[in-house]
């Protein structure tokens, strides 16, 4: 097996278990909230806690990795740490205890994605970068974190307790840390694309904001992280409390999100390599409106609802493009992990922290429909902003350059 392929799968599965642990609290929340008497506002704050520290750790962890070039060591330490934090979540017995453990987990998990994506970016050929980074970020995280997690964790919680579910969730990360030690190499930094020119080699990270794609990706990441976190946090409650599905039905419907994202982790980035980043981001972000729209207004069978949600969750396939591929093709190679940490960090702070906290507050005062309206609005905003992206896909740039060279 080629090293490039092995790297993608080791890091992709590792990130899958990152999301298995991150999403565990959402899928177990109906059990936790009943046991610890949480309000909707407290549910939103629990979802926000991890996003806040994830964002800060993602930026500073990525910047530290760029400065020291010790990406592998940082990755191994972070994976071991988040696994231990899952065990701590299992012993929490109050809102404050669980809130604190989720803050710690965010610190541990934050550096993993920017460091992993920088490793993949360095090892990927130009024509495969979007595909490789999409598979690394979305396939494992959604197959394990969104598809398998609700089925496994809800079943464990029903058979035992939610505490035991957290204990079990922490084990796979320790195994993946061993795989990283064995199979991942420290990369040799090289230019990623036409933007990686020697003239920019000495620029400060603040200079990144002069690139239009960087600040557009930051704002779109805020919108799409909010879109995703609102779905994770409030769909389980809406399914059970408003649509009156059983916990088992809820877990199956939530697992559809993982199946969709795993499937479209190949489709969306692959299409972007051929059709262009901008076109694909616009189209699939708009499709993201289908998820809240179907849950709010579709009255057919649960099977038909699952099909609509499967289609709508394809918008998750744009996340690695916004948070990885487009910034990495815009910024010089030596700043890739820092750039990705900036985009992911801002998305997590404002989208992952602010949106669920605000949604929980409005749900307590109005209804559980409000978070889903917010989710739809986020998808529309992201699609509108994508209209202004500067195309970075190497294949599209080559096609544009060919007529000029022929003249």
Placement of each model-derived feature along the sequence:
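Extracytoplasmic gate region of multi-pass secondary transporters
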Residues: 25-26, 213-262, 324
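Conserved MFS/SLC helix-loop-helix module at the cytosolic interface between two early adjacent transmembrane helices
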Residues: 56-93, 272-278
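Cytoplasmic helix-loop-helix junction between adjacent transmembrane helices
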Residues: 101-141
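Helix-loop-helix hairpin linking two adjacent transmembrane segments in secondary transporters
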Residues: 136, 140-182
């Amino acid at each position: 097996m080629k090293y490039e392929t092995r790297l993608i799968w080791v890091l992709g599965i590792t990130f899958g278990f990152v999301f298995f642990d991150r999403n565990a609290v959402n899928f177990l929340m109906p059990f936790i909230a009943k046991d610890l008497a949480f309000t909707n506002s407290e549910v939103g704050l629990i979802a926000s806690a991890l996003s806040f520290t994830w964002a800060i750790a993602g930026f500073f962890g990525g910047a530290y990795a760029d400065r020291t070039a010790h990406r592998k060591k940082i990755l191994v330490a972070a994976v071991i740490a988040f696994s231990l934090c899952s065990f701590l979540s299992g012993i929490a017995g109050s809102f404050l205890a669980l809130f604190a453990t989720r803050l710690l987990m965010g610190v541990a998990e934050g550096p993993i994605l920017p460091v992993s994506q920088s490793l993949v970016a360095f090892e990927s050929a130009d024509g495969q970068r979007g595909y490789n980074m999409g598979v690394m970020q979305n396939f494992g995280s959604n197959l394990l974190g969104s598809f398998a997690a609700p089925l496994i964790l809800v079943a464990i919680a029903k058979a035992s307790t939610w505490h035991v579910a957290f204990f079990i969730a922490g084990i796979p990360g320790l195994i993946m840390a061993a795989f990283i030690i064995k199979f991942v190499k420290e990369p040799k930094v090289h230019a990623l694309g036409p933007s990686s020119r020697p003239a920019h080699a000495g620029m400060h990270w603040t200079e990144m904001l002069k690139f239009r794609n960087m600040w557009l990706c930051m704002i779109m990441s805020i919108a799409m992280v909010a879109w995703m976190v609102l779905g994770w946090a409030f769909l389980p409650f809406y399914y059970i409390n408003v649509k009156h599905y059983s916990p088992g039905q809820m877990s199956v419907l939530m697992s559809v999100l993982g199946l969709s994202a795993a499937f479209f982790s190949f489709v969306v980035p692959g299409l972007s390599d051929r059709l262009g980043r901008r076109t694909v981001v616009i189209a699939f972000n708009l499709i993201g409106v289908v998820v809240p729209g179907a849950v709010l207004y579709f009255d057919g069978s649960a099977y038909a609802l699952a099909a609509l949600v499967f289609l709508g969750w394809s918008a998750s396939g744009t996340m690695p493009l916004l948070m990885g591929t487009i910034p990495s093709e815009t910024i010089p190679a030596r700043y890739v992990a820092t750039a990705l940490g900036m985009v992911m960090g801002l998305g997590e702070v404002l989208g992952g922290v602010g949106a669920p906290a605000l949604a929980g507050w409005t749900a307590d005062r109005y209804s559980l429909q409000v978070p889903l309206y917010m989710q739809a609005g986020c998808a529309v905003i992201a699609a509108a902003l994508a209209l202004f992206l500067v195309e970075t896909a190497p294949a599209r740039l080559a096609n544009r350059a060919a007529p000029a060279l022929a003249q």
